[in-house]
């Protein structure tokens, strides 16, 4: 009578892992190769998270609103900073659909917040990179912590 084999209920952590009928194993002879490629793949995920976060909105305390931080929005903010004066009564649409009067002080606060949040997320990505490089199992590395908050629509 043949023994019934247990099938895995998940994908292997890396393409180098093999199923022994009860758990995923990583043969010693491919451990460093698997570790290298898993770390490289995870680092790409971290960079993508940083990229997405930078475009996920920025919260400006003085008006209590989220502003867009897409590449297009950043370009508009940069252009407006080159103007000697903003158009009077310039109404700007925020991420929740409300409009606010965009003044020079508000544009300054918004610009500073964009730079500050970007630098914090950059530092966080670098922190995760260092920890990832130290990990013996980079395929299991959790990089979800330490990121700046991004806009989430209320449902």
Q: What is each residue range found by the language model?
A:
Residues 1-155:
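A preference for well-ordered globular domain cores
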């Amino acid at each position: 009578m043949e023994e019934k084999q247990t099938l895995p209920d998940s994908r292997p952590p890396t393409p180098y892992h093999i199923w022994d009928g009860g758990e995923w194993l990583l043969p010693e002879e491919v451990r460093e190769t698997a570790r290298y490629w898993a770390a490289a793949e995870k680092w790409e995920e971290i960079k993508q998270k940083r990229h997405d976060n930078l475009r996920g909105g920025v919260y400006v305390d003085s008006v209590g609103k989220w502003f867009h931080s897409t590449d297009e929005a950043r370009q508009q903010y940069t252009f407006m900073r080159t103007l000697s004066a903003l158009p009077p009564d310039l109404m700007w649409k925020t991420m929740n659909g409300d409009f606010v009067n965009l003044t020079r002080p508000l544009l300054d606060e918004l610009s500073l917040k964009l730079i500050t949040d970007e630098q914090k997320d950059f530092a966080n990505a670098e922190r995760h990179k260092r920890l990832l490089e130290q990990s013996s199992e980079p395929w299991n590395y959790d990089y979800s912590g330490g990121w700046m908050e991004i806009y989430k629509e209320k449902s």
